[in-house]
Regions:
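HIT superfamily nucleotide-processing domains
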Residues: 1-336
Length: 336
């Protein structure tokens, strides 16, 4: 029988369509005969083409000039930014009803490797550490700008996930507002704290450690699992075990451990599902609420194995055709 499952962190319902459920191995992607070169002469993110991007905001390099070769991780403004640093934060009305403001913010690209064809699962551990440390450095820098209310770090991998350039990269957006969907998620966590006196994500971790059927990986400080009410097959969360509302609280040592968990999970997915398209997002508290007790930063991975259709678009409720307990076991036990 199909199940309706409720996400304890958002109170949103998901349909687990067991009547049309697929086996985990049915989600393995068909092989695509596309071999990428380690370098492309016309790629703006490849070394030697630094003049094709705006001036860098930061880079980890072993030598060479600023905005030149020699780097292994590099952050630059997005050439086609959704938001720009200049402008006014004053909100204006139009036609006495509509509200608008200048698109002020910061939109950056974190170029994860000088190698054009090297994705995170195939990187050396040290390289993935440097990527996460770059996330941390840019977050800590941008949160000092009083104009910004929220910083979101995300990655689009593959065309179904919305990527437009093959070269491995992530993105960061610092915005002057907190979008309604994030405010909703935050308010639900606040409501749980008011009712129970605990962080709902900390409670989720404790429940996951008791049951363990959806657990994929556990280290000293981090946990990875498939959520009870997964929106899509193989959806994965990575959370710090200790309560931290903001990604900005992550230490250098924790960044390194987190990077190893992230790489391990993505490598399992790469091998088990044949390099699927996916998005990942680091969910974190708004800047002014970074010390609150009711939110808990985490990374969410959403593989793009199915396409949302009219029901999902019309209701906001997702239909998942895979049991999280089965997908977790499949990934957990898959040899890499």
């Amino acid at each position: 029988m199909p199940e309706l499952r409720q996400d304890p962190t958002t109170k949103q319902w998901v349909i687990i369509a067991t009547e049309r459920a697929k086996r985990p191995e049915d989600f393995v992607q068909q092989s695509i005969s596309l071999t990428l070169p380690p370098y492309k002469v016309d790629c703006p993110f490849c070394p030697g083409n630094e003049q094709m991007t705006p001036p860098e905001k930061m880079a980890y390099r072993s030598g060479g000039p600023v905005n030149g070769p020699g780097w292994w991780v590099r952050a630059v403004p997005n050439k086609f930014s959704a938001l720009i640093p200049e402008g006014s934060l004053i909100r204006k009305e139009e036609d006495g009803f509509f509200r608008k403001m200048d698109g002020v913010g910061q939109h950056e690209v974190i170029i994860e490797s000088p190698q054009h064809n090297l994705c995170i699962p195939l990187m050396e551990d040290k390289q993935v550490e440097e990527v996460v440390l770059a996330y941390r450095e840019r977050y800590l820098t941008l949160r000092e700008d009083p104009r910004f209310s929220l910083i979101i770090i995300f990655k689009n991998h593959g065309p179904r996930a919305g990527t437009s350039l093959e070269h491995p990269h992530s993105q960061l957006v610092a915005a002057p507002i907190v979008p309604l969907s994030i405010r909703y998620r935050y308010e639900k966590a606040m409501g749980h704290y008011d009712d129970a006196g605990t962080c709902v994500y900390c409670d989720y971790i404790r429940a996951g450690l008791r049951v363990r059927t959806r657990l994929i990986m556990e280290t000293e400080r981090f946990l990875a699992f498939h959520p009870f009410a997964s929106r899509a097959p193989f959806e994965t969360w990575i959370l710090p075990k200790e309560h931290e509302a903001s990604f900005g609280s992550i230490t250098v040592d924790d960044s390194k451990e987190f990077s190893r968990v992230l790489k391990a999970i993505l490598l399992k997915m790469y091998r088990a599902l044949n390099n699927p398209d996916y998005n990942y997002i680091i969910h974190t508290a708004p800047i002014k609420d970074e010390q609150e007790e009711y939110y808990h930063w985490h990374l969410q991975i959403l593989p793009r194995l199915v396409t949302p259709a009219g029901f999902e678009l019309g209701t906001g409720m997702f239909i998942n055709t895979a049991l999280p307990e089965e997908t977790a076991a499949f990934i957990r036990d898959f040899p890499v």
